[in-house]
Amino acid sequence: MNRIHAVILDWAGTTVDFGSFAPTQIFVEAFRQAFDVEITLAEARVPMGLGKWQHIEALGKLPAVDARWQAKFGRSMSAADIDAIYAAFMPLQIAKVVDFSSPIAGVIDTIAALRAEGIKIGSCSGYPRAVMERLVPAAAGHGYRPDHWVATDDLAAGGRPGPWMALQNVIALGIDAVAHCVKVDDAAPGISEGLNAGMWTVGLAVSGNEFGATWDAYQTMSKEDVAVRREHAASKLYAAGAHYVVDSLADLPGVIAHINARLAQGERP
């Protein structure tokens, strides 16, 4: 049938870890541990969605971070420096990721509703496999079990913003057309991934990296603060090319109904 057959979901900030805090804090700690260089949480969020080595590389190219690095070492960050930070990052992330494995509010019910419609649940992440091998069973213990998952270092072709992890889900799940898939993500590289794979794309403006608040902080925010943060996040996701932007995964079934109507009219992503 000419309808959505699969969703491919990001992990941190999309299905688990409201606000995407597990990776951001670890980047700050890894820079400090490896080279005694300080970066801010806001800086750590800028390249979110990329593979973690590529994320560190992108952080080193941020003008403010590069200026700090040059002031300390008299040069810009090298590949060997990135390797050293990544080596510090990995054990920290592996140790901490299980603490951020609880599904975001509404995720379990949404997954059940999608499966009731015959929709398969794929997933992929900017986390490497060593981290995912800890996160996946921890999330399963909380009730979140996608039908398939792909880590950023699984494929020789690479990770985001390329289409390969999303397309690997298409293959593994046996989906007949990429136009029958929706890629859901809270960061721009994941939206680019979906677009490059020829899929419909949905950005999440509140639950993830661009909004950047814990669940508790979000619950106590004023309506005005929520609106400002939501608009900031949505503008970035729309600028990346998202077909739709909603607050969280709980809003996805309504979006899929809208996409199904467009598919029935012959539209494509």
Swiss-Prot record:
Induction: Induced when inorganic phosphate is limiting; this is controlled by PhoB.
Entries under Pfam families matching the protein: Hydrolase
Cofactor: Mg(2+)
Enzyme class: hydrolase
Keywords: Hydrolase, Magnesium, Metal-binding, Schiff base
Keyword Magnesium found: yes
Recorded GO CC terms: cytosol
Note: Maps to a phosphate-starvation-inducible locus previously known as psiC.
Complex formation: Homodimer.
Name listed for the protein in its UniProt record: Phosphonoacetaldehyde hydrolase
Taxonomic source organism: Salmonella typhimurium (strain LT2 / SGSC1412 / ATCC 700720)
Name of encoding gene: phnX
